[in-house]
Amino acid sequence: MEGPSNPGENLGIISVNPNTCESIELTNQILAKTYTTSWTDMEVYARGNGRICTAYPDVDHPLQDVRGNVSSILERGERSGGFETHPPRDPVTPRERHGNIQTRGAVIAPTPFHVVAAIPQQTRKRRWDILDGMVRRTVSQSTVDPKTVVMCVYRREEEETYDVLDEEEQDDDLLGIPNPTPRRLRISQAGPQQNSWVDTRGRRAYGSQEEQDERTSTDQVSIFSHDETRELSSPLECPIVGCTASFVGPRRWEKAKSHIYGVHSLEEVREIPRGELICKGIVRCETCATLLPTSDRAKQAHRDDCRPYLPRKENIRRKRAAEREATEASAQQGIALRLERQGPYITPRDIEEPTNTTTESWWREKVATKRYLHRKEWPQWLDICRTVLLGYSASSQGERHQRQVMLLDLVRNHLHTRTARREQQQQRGKDNQEEEDRQKKEEKSLRNAWKPCASSVRQGGQPSSSQPKRLNRWSTAPKWLKQSGNCTRRRISMIFPGPPVEQPGVVSVDAEEVAKTIARRLTRGAAPGLDGWTRELLYPLTLDPALKMEIAAVVKDIINADVSMEVGRRLQATSLTVLRKPNGKYRPIGAESVWAKLASHIAISRVMKTAEKKFSGIQFGVGGHIEEAIAKIRKDFATKGSLAMLDGRNAYNAISRRAILEAVYGDSTWSPLWRLVSLLLGTTGEVGFYENGKLCHTWESTRGVRQGMVLGPLLFSIGTLATLRRLQQTFPEAQFTAYLDDVTVAAPPEELKNVCAATAEAMEALGIVNNADKTEVLELTGDTGFGTAVKRVREFLERTWPDPMSEEIREGVEKKAMETDRLFKAIVELPLYNRTRWRILAMSAMPRITFLLRNHDMQHTHRVASWFDERTTQVMEHILGQPMTERARNIAALPVSMGGCGIRRMAQVAEYAHQCAGEKGLQQRKTEEADQRQQDDLYATLGGADRQVFTANTAAGAGRPLTDAQVRLDDATFGVYLRERYCRVLPEGVKCLCGEDASNHHIHTGTKVHNKPRQMRHDIINSVFANGLRLCGFQCATEPRLNEVSKRRPDILIAGLDTYAVTDITVTYPGRVTVGNTAQGQRSVAAADPMKAALVAFQEKERKYSYWAIQNGLAFAPFVMLTNGAIFGKSRDWLRRVLRGQDHRLTVTTAFDGITADVVAAVLRGNVHVYSAAQARGETLR
C-alpha cells in the first residue's frame, strides 16, 4: 500500500498493489500509517461568475483539505449544518462559469423510485451519457429537467502548467520540501525513472522504450472515464422464476440463451415479468418470445428476422402505408418514440405522489364528442388511430405508458363537436396563459433563491430581520419531493387490502377474442366515459389486422395493471348520471370507460366457468340464470311453506369494498382478476357530476362497486358469497336463494322470523341495510311471526300467496304483459322509417314476452300470447299498408335464414317455453324443430315460381335488408321488399298494362313493359357499382367494346395498380328458371338450390365473355344477383380478389361490405320502378 507523498497536499488517493490471488486486508492501523487527514472550516466555498453556493460538511467526519485536487459534492433538498441548501439555477451545465470548477457527474431521479447517473462527455459539449442499469444512452442537455437532479458532483480543474511546476519544484528544493510528481505525469516507482512517454490515461506512446516490452508493468493513476472502463464480468442469472442457474465469462449471454431455450418452455419465457427482464438488461419480443439485449441495434436486427415472409405486393402496400403514415399526424408518434426508458413498473397503489385531479383538463370538463362514425369516415379515423397504436406492442414500458395517455385523448382531441371545439379552444388559451404565469413565477423564485442564502452565510448563518418571510417561502421543498402522508387519497387507500405478494402469471389476450368481445359483448349505443370512447368508435379498429393486434396489447396491459398512474386514475374516474326510479327515488349510474369495460369482459371470461361452480345453488345473478332461480324459489316455497324476499338499500354502492377485496384476494380462483381489480378498486376513484360539460361537484368513491361497472355484479356476488354460505350452514332448515342483491329466504313459518333477522344482521355487517319497503313475506299456512309487534326491529309487508290455480296469477301475468302495449303504440305513432319500426318490433318487443312465457305455466300465458300475436300482426299491417293473409303471417313467423322475417308466433312458443326453463338449449332445439315443420308445410303448399322465390329467400344475403343497417331503404322500397317475401306485391285482381294478371312472375319476366324499367334498374346498379370501386382507387370504364365490329359490351372495365378486371352485371328473377331445377320433385327446402337461377345466368355470361377476357389478360367473372338482393358466391369471391389487389385506405372487408350494401339497395330501388311501370296510371306504390 502506498499513500500520498505529501500529506500537506493530500490527493485523497490510496494505491493498492496486491500480488496475484492475494487477499486484501485494510484495517484502521494500516490506514493510519499511510493516510492522514486534516480538519478544515465548516464551510467550503465554490465561487463562479458572481454566484455563491455553499456546501456544509457533516460535523461527524473530517473533510479533506480542498486546496488540492478533490471533488466537491452538492446535494439538493438536504439539510446540512442546520440550514437547507439550494442548487444553482442550472446544475447540469457541462462546465461551471468559473474556470477552476468542472461538473463531473450528476444523479437524476426521473421518478421518485428510480435514479440514473449522468456523466458529461469530454469531446462533445452539452451531451450527457445516461447510465441506467446496464443501459447506456447519450442525450442532449436540453432533454434533462433540472428539477429532477438530486445531486451534482464537481471537481476542481488543474490550472498548473509545466513551467509553473518547474518553478514550484525549485522553490520546494530551497525549502527542503519533497516535491511530488505531477498527477498527469506520475507513474509507479517500480517503473523507469526517465520520461516514459505515457499519456494522461496511462497508455504508452509511439517510440517509447516500453513499447516493445510487454512484460513491463506500470501502475499508472489515470483519470476515471466511463468510456474506458470495461464492464465487470458479473454472473448472469437465469430470469425464469425458480431457476438458480447462473453464467459467467465473456460469452455468458450466449450460454444463458442456450439454457433458456433448451431447458425451459416458451410459456415460461412469456410469463417473465417485463420489469424483471429490464432490470437484467433484457427485453422480450412479444411476437415470438425471443430474449435479446436492450439495445436499439439488437432490436432492429431482431425485427428484420421476426417478420414473416410477405409477398411483393404486400410489401409494396405496407411501404406505402408507412410513407402515408409518416406524412400524416406523425408528430405525436415521433415524440413517443424518443421517450426515455423507465425502470421496472410499480403499481399505482405503491406510488406516493400528490395528485390534484381537479386541475387536469380531462377531469375539469366533459367534452361533447361523436359517439359513432359513418362507414365513409372510418378511413380517416383509422389513420388517426394508427399514429398512436402502431408500434405499441414493440415499445418499451415508458413508451407504452405515454401512448396510453395519448390513446385516451384521441376522441377528445379529434372527434369533439363544433361547439365543444370552440369552447375547448377558448379554455386552452386560458390554460396556456396560466401555465406561462406559473412558469414565470417559478423562474423568478429560482433566480432569487440564492440571494437570501448568501446573505445569511455572510452574517454567520443567521438571516437578517428583514428576511424571515422570504426565507419561509423559499425554504419549502420542491413539489415532487413533498410526501402525501396527509393526502386523502393516501389515507383512504391504506384501508384497502392489496393483492398477494406472489402474483399469478401474466393474463394473455388473443386478438381474435378481443375483436369478438367488441362486436358481441360491448353494449351498442352505451354512454361513453370521460375519454369519449364508445363501442362504435372501437369496432372499426378491429377490421384492420395491425390495429387489432395493438388493441389486444393495450387490453393486456390494462388487465395486468401495466399502466401509468394517470391512466389508472382516468380508468377509475366516472361521470355520474342520475336516473329517476318509478317510486320517485334516484339511481346513480357511473359511465365506465369502454377500455375498462373491454378489459373486464376479457377478465370475466377467464373465471366464468369457475364462477358458476362457486355460485352453484345459492347465487344465480352471475351468468343470467334467472329461470333456475325462480324454479328453485317455487320449489323451496312449496316445501318450506313460507318465504321472505329481502332487498338491500343501495346495495351496490353500500357494500364494504374492503370485504370485496379480501374475498377476491383470499381465493386463488379469482387470480386472473387481481391486477385489474386492484387497478379499478384498489384506490379511491373520482366521481364527478357535470352540467353542460362543466364539473359541478365531485365525490370520492370509497365503498362498494359503481352501478354501470362491468365487474360490478361479479364482485358483488363474490363479496356476499361467504356470508350466504355461512348462513346456510347456520340454518340448515332454511334455503337461501340470491340474485345479486335480492335474497330470498325459505323456511318453516315458525323459523322464518329468526332466519330473516340473522340474514339482515349479516348483511348489515357488510354494509348493506335491508329495505323494509321492498320486503315481502309469503306463506301458505301458519303464522310467520311478522306483525306490528316487531315494528321496532324491521317492518315487513305481509300478504298471502294465492292458489297456483287461481285467476289472480293469470291476471298478474296479463297486467305485466299489457305494459308492452306502450311500445306498440310508440312504433305506430312516432315518425320513424318503416325499416326502423320493423327492427324495433323484432328486436325489442319479442324478448319482453318471452320472459313471461318461460317463467309461468301455459294456462296462465296462453291468453297473453294470443293477444301479443294479434297486436304484432296489426303493427306489421300498418308497416305494409295492407292486410296480411294467413300464409303471409306464417312466412313472417319463420326466421330470416329460413325465408321468413323473424316475427314468431308467441302462442306456439308458450306451449313448450315453461317446460324448458332450467334446461340449457332445450327451448332452442324445440323452436328449431317447430320452424322446420312450418317451413316444410309452406313449401308443400307452394308451387311453380312461388316455390322458387320462397326457396331463393333462404339464400345467403337474401335477408340482409332486414338485418344489416348498411342497406338503407326508403319506405316504398322496404314495403316492396317485404311484400315480395310474402309472395305477392300488388293486390289480388290488379292487372298489368298489357292486360295480364300483375303477379310477381309476370312483372319480372314480361316483355311488354313500357319505358324499359329493368334496363333502368340495370343502369342504376352499374353506376353504383362503379362509384364504389372508384372510392377504392380504381379507374372504371363502362361498356367497353370487345372489338371494332362486335356489338357485345361488358358492363365495367376495372383498372388498378396491379389489377385489370372486367365484369358484366346481371339481375335475374328466381322464378325465371322452372325446368330442371329444385322446384320439380323436391319435398323440402333443404334439398333445393336457392341460387339455381343465378347459376344459370352466371354460366351464360361466362360463356359469352370469358374467352375474350383471357385473350386480353383480364380477370373476368359475371356479377350475378337475384331480385331479392342475394349475390352469387363466385361473384362475391371475384369482388374480394379485385379489392385485395388494390392498395386503398379501406380494408377489404369494409370496402366489400360498403359496395355490396349499396348495390343491394340499388337493386331493391330498381324493383320499385319495375312494379310502378307495370301498374295502371294514377296508382303509385306505397
UniProtKB/Swiss-Prot annotation:
<keyword id="KW-0814">Transposable element</keyword>
<feature type="region of interest" description="Disordered">
    <location>
        <begin position="77"/>
        <end position="97"/>
    </location>
</feature>
<feature type="region of interest" description="Disordered">
    <location>
        <begin position="317"/>
        <end position="339"/>
    </location>
</feature>
<dbReference type="GO" id="GO:0003964">
    <property type="term" value="F:RNA-directed DNA polymerase activity"/>
</dbReference>
<feature type="compositionally biased region" description="Basic and acidic residues">
    <location>
        <begin position="420"/>
        <end position="446"/>
    </location>
</feature>
<feature type="region of interest" description="Disordered">
    <location>
        <begin position="163"/>
        <end position="220"/>
    </location>
</feature>
<protein>
    <recommendedName>
        <fullName>Retrotransposable element SLACS 132 kDa protein</fullName>
        <ecNumber>2.7.7.49</ecNumber>
    </recommendedName>
</protein>
<keyword id="KW-0695">RNA-directed DNA polymerase</keyword>
<feature type="domain" description="Reverse transcriptase">
    <location>
        <begin position="560"/>
        <end position="790"/>
    </location>
</feature>
<dbReference type="InterPro" id="IPR000477">
    <property type="entry name" value="RT_dom"/>
</dbReference>
<dbReference type="InterPro" id="IPR043502">
    <property type="entry name" value="DNA/RNA_pol_sf"/>
</dbReference>
<keyword id="KW-0548">Nucleotidyltransferase</keyword>
<keyword id="KW-0808">Transferase</keyword>
<feature type="compositionally biased region" description="Acidic residues">
    <location>
        <begin position="163"/>
        <end position="174"/>
    </location>
</feature>
<dbReference type="Pfam" id="PF00078">
    <property type="entry name" value="RVT_1"/>
</dbReference>
<feature type="region of interest" description="Disordered">
    <location>
        <begin position="418"/>
        <end position="478"/>
    </location>
</feature>
<feature type="compositionally biased region" description="Polar residues">
    <location>
        <begin position="456"/>
        <end position="475"/>
    </location>
</feature>
